[in-house]
Amino acid sequence: RTEYLFLSHCHKDHSGAFSRLVSRGFRGWLVAAGATVELARIRYNKVIQADPLSAWPMGLGRDLHFSCGRSGHCVGGLWFHIWDSGKSCFYSGDYQPGPLAFAVDQVKGRRADLAIVDCAHPDTQEDARALRSRILEWIGPCIADGRRVVLPLPRYGRGLELIALIKENFPQAEIAADQGFTAAVEQVCGYGEWLRAGREEQIRAFLEEQPEKRLERDVYDILLLGDTHLEQERCRSLAERELARGGLVIITGRVKPGGFVQTLLDGKKAVRAHFPHHQSMGDFMALLEQNNFQTVVPFHNGRRELYFQAAGTGSKRGLG
């Protein structure tokens, strides 16, 4: 009976269930950015392409409307504001207000009865700049000592952010990457409207350095692997090789329970750093202050909480 399904972006933890929904009978409209549909390789004949650059809300019938904006998380990443004549809902998707590489349309001055808001890092108040500085504190001393840094990453997402971060702070560092990662980076260069000004040129310059050739020649300071959980045998082998040489593996995202990355962390063979590709608790609270959301559900963490706002004040209620 679902008429509309709003998909925020292409990452598997969001798009991966779509085919299952279809197999279970979903025949409604999929609302998503065209880039999301393409990168997630969705084949479906009822798609409404959401345009974050449109100056006008889009009507869906029966007095239902929505507007959207770029979420700063990845190519195709969106937030949605949905309303009808009675109620309204805001959904942040995976949101980051201060990205380096991705364009973001700031969420300010919006009102919603219900808001579902990214709060993936609830244990820190630090903003994106502060969290990025933590990662630099790992990378800098390591490469200064002649040791290599390995960063397992998703193919679409924070890899571009890390390229920008490394280029800005360690311009002389040689970056290598596996072929899967470089192919994905080349693919997203075709979506310039999702990148901040100047970043497409920076990323193309990175590709012209032929990072996969540096990997073949074994000449590099930092290795980017397009395999978040190190599930591919070649990526696991490369990580283990650099660990044996005294290198450092930095985990910047979600850890799959029982996986190889979890084993590395448990054995203190890797370190974990919060990368600001989602919101911290500080970001989350700032977003609430900048908008009028009556009931707020934080997501992307294991907590069960609701936040309520009334007359400029806020309160929190745990759900057990």
Residue map of PLM features:
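Short, charged, surface-exposed secondary-structure boundary motifs
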Residues: 40-42, 100-102, 125-126, 184-189, ...
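His/Asp/Glu-rich metal-coordinating catalytic cores
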Residues: 1-6, 11-157, 164-174, 200
